[in-house]
């Protein structure tokens, strides 16, 4: 049965077609917002996957290049692996959806979103987010939805609901908020130092808009939604928990997890698990789920310790940060390096500077963004958690963590005019026990400062956690969560910022949303903690950016020329610019607007190249003194080169004060001589003189 629904959303029409396409999917919706079209589907396997202790949810966001009238690049001329934007969008969709599936559901579920056309006024990422929630809501897949998402931009202090792509790219706020009918369930933000109060206001304006979308989804579900199918529960039987408590009492489990040493805790749990394995040796069903059962036993113990007893596993107070350490310049010869340690989480960040020709090229659906100047890459090797496995390159988690730390620093980076460099920061995880992305933010900030990047302000990040009870008022917010509190808690609320405001937020949640008091307390806690980190730790390692770039970094000078003179600098088939490069050893980049960047390791060579470019692009003025090289000798005079492609002639009568019969009597090829420009002769040609050069020139 085909039905079409529509609603007005932020001044544009959102249209949803159900039953028109993809009838074999569990749920499908074809959405059009303006002229942006996205096909969203939800499918689930018939049976649970054996031998797993997690919910196997996959989310895909497919960018089809035909959506913007492009043919993909490369030899294959078809879409390849997912872009960074696709991965980040899929993660944003995953985070609010995952908590709304049953906790004991183990069937494979795939949410697929295919972008089929793009209207620059309506961002496809937002449409896909709404589409995934709707397709799942009307399907027969067990799901405690719907949820809805809204994006908020800001320009000149005014909020923009669901901004256009241009408004999103150029605004001061990039906020995405997902909500259920009662609570906020996901927050993702990048911001130009937005004050905490303004950010909270924006979050709850999104929450209000979400309620209209949820009402729209509920109407569709009531009319054509499928009944939810029955499924095989993978819940641990209560009698198994009772037997486990007989073998290891809650007090013994509490003693096992109550330590600030991650390795000690893991060894304690390993020994406890061995006891259970011996006791349940003849019960194959219980052995099959023992790992999940031990996890849940630990979880109940830790949550009770925190919520009821106000005891954290490592003995810290609720608002206490782990021991901190920071240092810079630990790696020689690189352009900038720093290490930041928080408890058993340790990040080493290394910054590399390069000319602007090294910026990352982006071929995506957003035609406003074709390059990326600042790149932050995050690596998470297995040794950082004491494990052994081969490295297969960055996964979605690594890409997500790198993007978060990147987003945190972008607002404080200098402009291209102020600092004409491409910048790459790489965060290497040396040790991990929670919140490595926030440690990466702190380390990369210090590394940029050590490299001489003139960032406007210092940035730090911290994460807060949460443990909730049976009611909305029964909760405890934790500052600086470690791994165990992340695993067994309900929230990972990451916030980065300066002293003056927030630059990034990422909220991961395991429950059905947060009340406003929790959101406000978490944001307030993170501000207090990040200010402490900057003032008491980071600023003592490096208080401000170095005045000059590192000695091993390339030096870059930038000048601006008349765009009409670009051809003179380049020369026929690149002859002139290649000659400048060959003579000086520098690298030259020229934009269409006439911005010329000259990059090299030798300041003298850079200055020489810039002088050449200035000579090439500047008309000679009467009285101007120049140095030229004799490149040709004729009977009537000598030709001098002042820069590649820029020559002038000195008549034989202007070479020496006394009369000479032959130019060769005074000049030879390759001689460097000073000349003065005499202006134009009767024929309109520029003439030069050697003999009229002032003695003090």
Task: Label each region the model flagged.
Residues 103-109, 144-146, 213-231, 283-290, ...:
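Flexible, glycine/charged-enriched surface loops at secondary-structure junctions
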Residues 113, 185-190, 231-235, 244-256, ...:
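Short, hydrophobic beta-strand segments
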Residues 1-45, 49, 53, 232-369, ...:
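Extended amphipathic alpha-helical scaffolds
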Residues 27-29, 37, 122-141, 327-351, ...:
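Conserved phosphate/anionic-ligand binding catalytic regions in large, soluble enzymes, centered on
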């Amino acid at each position: 049965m085909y039905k079409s629904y529509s609603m007005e959303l932020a001044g544009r029409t959102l249209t949803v077609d159900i039953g028109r396409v993809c009838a074999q999917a569990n749920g499908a919706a074809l959405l059009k917002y303006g002229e942006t079209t996205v096909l969203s589907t939800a499918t689930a396997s018939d049976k649970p996957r054996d031998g797993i202790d997690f919910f196997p949810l996959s989310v895909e966001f497919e960018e089809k290049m035909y959506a913007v009238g492009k043919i993909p690049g490369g030899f294959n001329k078809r879409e390849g692996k997912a872009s960074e934007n696709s991965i980040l969008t899929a993660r944003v969709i995953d985070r609010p959806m995952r908590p709304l599936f049953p906790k004991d559901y183990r069937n494979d579920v795939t949410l697929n979103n295919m972008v089929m056309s793009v209207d620059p006024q309506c961002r496809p990422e937002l449409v896909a987010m709404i589409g995934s929630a709707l397709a799942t809501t009307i399907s027969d897949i067990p799901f405690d939805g719907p949820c809805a998402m809204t994006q908020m931009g800001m320009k000149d202090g005014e909020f923009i609901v669901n901004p256009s792509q241009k408004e999103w790219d150029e605004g001061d706020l990039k906020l995405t908020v997902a909500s259920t009918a009662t609570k906020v369930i996901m927050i993702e933000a990048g911001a130009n130092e937005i004050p905490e109060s303004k950010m909270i206001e924006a979050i709850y304006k999104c929450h209000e808009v979400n309620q209209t979308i949820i009402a729209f989804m509920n109407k569709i579900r009531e009319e054509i939604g499928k009944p939810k199918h029955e499924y095989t529960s993978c819940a641990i039987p209560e009698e198994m928990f009772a037997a486990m408590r007989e073998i290891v009492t809650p007090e013994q489990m509490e003693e096992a997890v109550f330590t600030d040493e991650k390795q000690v805790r893991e060894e304690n749990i390993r020994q406890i698990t061995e006891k259970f394995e011996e006791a349940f040796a003849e019960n194959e069903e219980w052995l099959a789920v023992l790992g999940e059962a031990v996890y849940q036993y630990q979880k109940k113990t830790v949550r009770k310790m925190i919520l009821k007893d106000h005891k954290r596993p490592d003995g810290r107070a609720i608002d206490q940060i782990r021991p901190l350490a920071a240092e810079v310049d630990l790696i020689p010869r690189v352009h900038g390096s720093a290490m930041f340690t928080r408890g058993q989480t340790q990040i080493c960040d290394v910054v590399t500077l390069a000319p602007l020709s090294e910026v990352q090229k982006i071929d995506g659906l957003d035609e406003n963004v074709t390059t990326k100047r600042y790149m932050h890459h995050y690596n998470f090797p297995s040794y950082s958690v004491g494990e052994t496995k081969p490295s297969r390159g960055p996964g979605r988690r690594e890409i997500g963590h790198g993007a978060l730390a990147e987003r945190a620093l972008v607002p404080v980076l200098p402009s291209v005019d102020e600092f004409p460099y491409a910048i790459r920061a790489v965060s290497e995880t040396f040790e991990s026990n929670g919140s490595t992305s926030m440690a990466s933010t702190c380390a990369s900030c210090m590394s940029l400062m050590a490299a001489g990047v003139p960032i406007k302000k210092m940035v730090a990040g911290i994460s807060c956690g949460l443990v909730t009870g049976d009611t909305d008022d029964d909760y405890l917010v934790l500052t600086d969560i470690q791994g165990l509190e992340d695993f067994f808690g309900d929230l990972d609320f990451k916030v980065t910022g300066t002293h003056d405001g927030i630059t990034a937020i990422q909220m991961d949640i395991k429950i059905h949303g947060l009340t406003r008091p929790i959101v406000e307390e978490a944001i307030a806690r993170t501000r207090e903690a990040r200010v402490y980190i900057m003032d008491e730790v980071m600023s003592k390692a490096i208080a401000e950016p170095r005045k000059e770039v590192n000695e091993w970094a390339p030096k870059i000078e930038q000048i601006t020329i008349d765009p009409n003179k670009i051809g003179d600098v380049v020369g026929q088939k690149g002859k002139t610019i290649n000659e400048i490069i060959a003579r000086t050893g520098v690298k030259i980049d020229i934009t269409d607007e006439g911005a010329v960047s000259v990059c090299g390791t030798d300041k003298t060579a850079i200055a020489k190249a810039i002088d050449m470019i200035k000579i090439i692009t500047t008309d000679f003025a009467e009285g101007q003194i120049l140095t030229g090289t004799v490149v040709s000798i004729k009977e009537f005079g000598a030709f001098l080169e002042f820069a590649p492609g820029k020559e002038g002639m000195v008549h034989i009568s202007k070479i020496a004060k006394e009369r000479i019969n032959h130019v060769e009597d005074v000049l030879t090829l390759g001689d460097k001589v000073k000349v003065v420009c005499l202006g134009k002769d009767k024929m309109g040609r520029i003439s030069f003189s050697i003999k009229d050069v002032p003695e003090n020139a």
